[in-house]
Amino acid sequence: MSNTGTTGRVPLWFVGMIVGLAALGLLGIFFYGSYTGLGSSL
């Protein structure tokens, strides 16, 4: 894997993927908690 212009740095698509997965994970945990009653107090 050779990404041009991203030597010594993390590729932008990789950062975007990690941020996207983290956001989806947090939303999933929040909605799951609200449905099960754990996050209803938030």
Swiss-Prot record:
Membrane-crossing residue ranges in chain numbering: 12-32
Subcellular location: Plastid, Chloroplast thylakoid membrane
A Gene Ontology cellular-component term: photosystem II reaction center
Subunit comment: PSII is composed of 1 copy each of membrane proteins PsbA, PsbB, PsbC, PsbD, PsbE, PsbF, PsbH, PsbI, PsbJ, PsbK, PsbL, PsbM, PsbT, PsbX, PsbY, PsbZ, Psb30/Ycf12, at least 3 peripheral proteins of the oxygen-evolving complex and a large number of cofactors. It forms dimeric complexes.
Top-level taxon of origin: Eukaryota
Primary localization: plastid
Family membership: Belongs to the PsbJ family.
Keyword flag Transmembrane helix: yes
Biological process per Gene Ontology, one example term: photosynthesis
Stored NCBIfam families: PRK02565.1
Protein name (database record): Photosystem II reaction center protein J
Any matching Pfam family: PsbJ
InterPro entries: PSII_PsbJ (IPR002682), PSII_PsbJ_sf (IPR037267)
General function of this protein: One of the components of the core complex of photosystem II (PSII). PSII is a light-driven water:plastoquinone oxidoreductase that uses light energy to abstract electrons from H(2)O, generating O(2) and a proton gradient subsequently used for ATP formation. It consists of a core antenna complex that captures photons, and an electron transfer chain that converts photonic excitation into a charge separation.
UniProt topology in membrane: Single-pass membrane protein
Keywords annotated in UniProt: Chloroplast, Membrane, Photosynthesis, Photosystem II, Plastid, Reaction center, Thylakoid, Transmembrane, Transmembrane helix
